[in-house]
């Protein structure tokens, strides 16, 4: 019997007093797609960073083709044929797509001169397998979904024997995801071994052969997916039953709350046009649509992050002169970006500093000195409410898992006691247990009278969480769906231009 391509035995990793991994095992066979599952903070990303040479284990052994190895750096991992596609974007924004794709490959091959024409030709050939993206474009000019495809294409240039994909479809459209799945199946057929990290059970059961589950930094089990159901995997991940992923929606008698936010005919002259809708007090209003439809741009236009050429935003009936995000925060409107590391959090700063950063004025005394005790109390309160897994509020945010970083980003917005919260992909890349916690928090905030707008590309989240749903198509409101009218088919028809609903003028 052939040796596994990768064997992990007894690996432990400490970050100070925090034990991120405790004596874990993992085996990857040749030509298999192996799912790695667990809640955020379970240790998945830590192990993948060890395999990819980003981190060094405190204890344990790694074998490649049966031989013990020390993977001391990402370059050493690449030499062994191991590639990692991070969940978070790690590209050079001012370089072109082609330059980003071949940066690691050219470093590895050490060519004395760069043939840019050949580089662009080879890069375009790889990129065409995923999407029609011009590799001469600057990465900073691409949307997040296209940047994620560049990350994947970059890994495909390395001729990997082991490819690690960490939430690769989190920012992709359905069409883009299907193209990626086709490539994964081709790679598998050619003997490439793939570690697939995802919280999307449908993807795992469609693509993967086996699943390994981690919980609280420990190895739980490895099973053939053919022998399991999605509920089996979830139970192994969380160690408990998830009884209700989505809290109860508003009852019919609760849906008549007064309008708290009015968006009247706003346009930016390019990405969204004549957008009109209302948000009721205590309501969770979902906004759906295809990636690139203008959902994010509408939210940015409301809160001063994107200039508007027309229209008015009113809060409690009063027009708000919002020209910058600071104006929106002062008025009581906050926005959680879909790009949490680019716009949502400060990785090098502490958890306490991140949570308090939007309202430092309230935490300073008459002479402008920060009240550290008040800051700590504020941060500790919100970190506990959102169940942030941490060693302490003074820990840097970069030490947290992706899901816990997202919780800190949400806590930062909540700390200013907003009247309206706009959340763009609030649970992207977060495990099922953390999703349930965040959904519970959102419903509690709505019950306290806050108006909440949720933009999501996850259909179950839109349908399960929203009291009312707007669908955006080509920068315009294509229609509105009440709780009773919501269905996946109805959303898809509106998003693709195949159906109609009540006019946007009646969206409130």
From Swiss-Prot:
Membrane topology: Peripheral membrane protein
InterPro entries per the UniProt record, alphabetical: AAA+_ATPase, ABC_carbohydrate_import_ATPase, ABC_transporter-like_ATP-bd, ABC_transporter-like_CS, P-loop_NTPase
SUPFAM superfamilies for this protein: P-loop containing nucleoside triphosphate hydrolases
Keyword field contains Nucleotide-binding: yes
The protein's Enzyme Commission number: 7.5.2.7
Catalyzed reactions: D-ribose(out) + ATP + H2O = D-ribose(in) + ADP + phosphate + H(+)
Cellular compartments per GO CC: plasma membrane
Alphabetized UniProt keyword annotations: ATP-binding, Cell inner membrane, Cell membrane, Membrane, Nucleotide-binding, Plasmid, Repeat, Sugar transport, Translocase, Transport
GO MF annotation, one: ATP binding
Location(s) in or outside the cell: Cell inner membrane
Enzyme class: translocase
Domain ABC transporter: 6-241, 254-499
Superkingdom of origin: Bacteria
A Pfam family assignment: ABC_tran
Record: residues binding ATP: 38-45
Assembly notes: The complex is composed of an ATP-binding protein (RbsA), two transmembrane proteins (RbsC) and a solute-binding protein (RbsB).
Family: Belongs to the ABC transporter superfamily. Ribose importer (TC 3.A.1.2.1) family.
Function according to Swiss-Prot or TrEMBL: Part of the ABC transporter complex RbsABC involved in ribose import. Responsible for energy coupling to the transport system.
The protein's name: Ribose import ATP-binding protein RbsA 2
Organism of derivation: Rhizobium etli (strain ATCC 51251 / DSM 11541 / JCM 21823 / NBRC 15573 / CFN 42)
Name of the gene encoding the protein in the UniProt record: rbsA2
């Amino acid at each position: 019997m052939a040796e596994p391509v990768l064997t992990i035995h007894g690996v432990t990793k400490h970050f100070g007093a925090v034990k991120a991994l405790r004596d874990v095992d993992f085996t990857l066979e040749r030509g298999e797609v192996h799912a790695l599952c667990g809640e955020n903070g379970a240790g998945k990303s830590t192990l993948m960073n060890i395999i990819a040479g980003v981190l060094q284990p405190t204890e344990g052994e790694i074998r490649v083709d049966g031989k013990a190895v020390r993977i001391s750096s990402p370059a050493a991992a690449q030499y062994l044929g191991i590639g990692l596609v991070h969940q978070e974007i790690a590209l050079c924004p001012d370089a072109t797509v082609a330059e980003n794709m071949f940066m690691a490959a050219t470093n590895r091959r050490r060519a004395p001169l760069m043939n840019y024409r050949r580089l662009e030709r080879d890069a375009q050939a790889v990129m065409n397998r995923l999407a029609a993206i011009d590799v001469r474009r600057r990465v900073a000019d691409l949307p997040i979904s296209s940047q994620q495809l560049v990350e994947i294409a970059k890994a495909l240039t390395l001729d990997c024997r082991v490819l690690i994909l960490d939430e690769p479809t989190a920012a992709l459209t359905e069409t883009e995801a299907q193209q990626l799945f086709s490539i994964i199946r081709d790679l598998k057929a050619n003997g490439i071994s793939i570690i697939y990290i995802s919280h999307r059970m449908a993807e795992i059961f469609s693509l993967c052969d086996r699943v390994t589950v981690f919980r609280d930094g420990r190895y739980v089990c490895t099973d053939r997916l053919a022998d399991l159901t999605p509920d089996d995997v979830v139970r192994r991940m969380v160690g408990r039953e998830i009884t209700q992923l989505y809290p109860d929606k508003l009852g019919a008698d609760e849906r008549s709350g007064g309008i708290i936010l009015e968006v009247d005919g706003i346009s930016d002259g390019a990405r969204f046009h004549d957008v009109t809708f209302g948000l009721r007090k205590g309501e969770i209003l979902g906004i759906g649509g295809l990636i690139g439809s203008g959902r994010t741009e509408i939210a940015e236009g409301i809160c001063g992050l994107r200039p508007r050429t027309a229209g008015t935003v009113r809060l409690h009936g009063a027009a708000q002169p919002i020209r910058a995000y600071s104006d929106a925060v002062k008025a009581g409107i906050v926005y959680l970006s879909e790009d949490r590391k680019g716009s949502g959090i400060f990785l090098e700063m502490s958890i306490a500093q991140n949570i308090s950063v939007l309202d430092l004025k309230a935490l300073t005394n008459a002479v402008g000195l920060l009240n550290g005790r008040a800051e700590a109390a504020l941060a500790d309160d919100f970190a506990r409410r959102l169940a942030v897994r941490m060693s302490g509020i003074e820990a840097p945010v970069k030490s947290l898992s992706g899901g816990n970083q997202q919780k800190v980003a949400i806590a930062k917005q909540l700390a200013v006691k907003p009247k309206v919260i706009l959340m763009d992909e609030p649970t992207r890349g977060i495990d099922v247990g953390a999703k349930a916690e965040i959904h519970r928090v959102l419903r509690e905030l709505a019950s306290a009278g806050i108006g909440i707008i949720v933009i999501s590309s996850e259909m179950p989240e839109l349908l399960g969480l929203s009291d009312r749903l707007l669908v955006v198509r080509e920068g315009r409101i294509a229609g509105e769906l009440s709780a009773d009218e919501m269905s996946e088919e109805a959303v898809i028809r509106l998003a693709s231009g195949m159906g109609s609903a009540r006019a946007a003028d009646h969206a409130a």
